[in-house]
Amino acid sequence: MELIYGSTMRKKWIEPALRFLPVGLCISALALMLKSKEGNENGILEYKHVGAFRYLAYANGICAAYSVLSTFNSVVPRSCSLSRAWFVFVFDQAFTYLMLGAGAVVTEVLYLAYKGDEKITWFEICPYYGRFCNRVAASLVISFLALLCFIPLSLISAYRVFSKYDPPSLCKKDQITSQS
């Protein structure tokens, strides 16, 4: 935490930068996903035909909006009350897990699209829809880059919340048994 709280200059720009960077990343991933459409003699494949891809698109849109709001919240000087710290902590955790969950689901579906699974008669589709798969894969990679911004933000907000509490007292085993 020295990197975050050591220098005043570092403290002033690291968190807002980590909060603003996902805006561009999430919007880029969202735009790529929305443009993912390809047709051939087998039919037309769009992102909206696959629930996991819609989930990632929605997650990127929601996280971009949250990043804008949280960036504004981090640059406007306010007192760091316990309730505000908890609010930021809960939302940082929620959006980090939203991105993680969406990325994990799309990773699995994309793996099946590339490799298939003959045991359950799920055949690979990426040889037939290569451009579509490449765009979805690029959107997924960009989403994971946004996740790499959300993870340290979750750690920073967790540190802010839990540093406001006293550590638990350490008791010896004899003290515990004598109190019972």
UniProtKB/Swiss-Prot annotation:
Pfam families named among the record's database cross-references: CASP_dom
Transmembrane regions: 14-34, 56-76, 86-106, 136-156
Keyword NAD: no
InterPro entries listed in its UniProt record: CASP/CASPL, CASP_dom
Alphabetical keyword list: Cell membrane, Membrane, Transmembrane, Transmembrane helix
Extracellular side: 35-55, 107-135
Membrane topology: Multi-pass membrane protein
Record's GO cellular component terms: plasma membrane
Quaternary structure, from the entry: Homodimer and heterodimers.
Family: Belongs to the Casparian strip membrane proteins (CASP) family.
Protein name per Swiss-Prot or TrEMBL: CASP-like protein 2A3
Species name: Picea sitchensis (Sitka spruce)
